[in-house]
Design a protein with these regions (language model features):
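Glycine-rich phosphate- or other oxyanion-binding loops that anchor nucleotides, phosphorylated ligands
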Residues: 1-145
Length: 145
């Protein structure tokens, strides 16, 4: 997964702090299957390639020089992307009976950063801006189309 790609999240690994305070971590953070299908359909109709699968919600997004990073572990476990909000949104929506899904615009890959340094991270790229616009378009199409 690279900057400018899109990811449709099926579910989120709950490595954040907030969702753990709402319900036990054994409670799954999942998207609504019908909305996943609608997002996929909107992407296919528009000829847009999207990655799909699990995402990692973590409040420690960047590697730390002392603690290191568990991102290689999650990559081996087939996690597609790292972000900071989806698990909490999925849990809260599920608890309140609200359908939910997420399409993410990828702005970089922390596994590609030299030695864990984020010095070369640059989300201000045309490919990322285009992905954000496309993700909004897909979400609107999935909800209204």
């Amino acid at each position: 997964v690279s900057a400018g790609d899109l990811v449709i999240a099926h579910a989120a690994v709950r490595e954040d702090g907030l969702s753990r305070k709402i319900v036990p971590v054994s409670y799954p953070a999942t998207a609504t299957p019908d909305l996943i299908i609608k997002l996929r359909s909107a992407a296919n109709s528009a000829g847009i390639n999207c990655h799909e699968g699990l995402v990692l919600t973590s409040d420690m997004f960047y590697p730390h020089e002392i603690l290191g990073s568990d991102l290689p572990l999650w990559q081996r476990a087939s996690v597609t992307a790292v972000e900071m909000e989806v698990a909490t949104l999925f849990v809260i929506c599920r608890l309140h009976g609200v359908e939910t899904a997420a399409v993410l615009a990828i702005d970089g890959n922390p596994l590609n950063q030299d030695g864990g340094s984020m010095d070369t991270y640059n989300p201000n790229q045309d490919s990322v801006r285009n992905a954000v616009t496309t993700s909004i378009t897909l979400a609107l199409e999935a909800l209204t189309g």
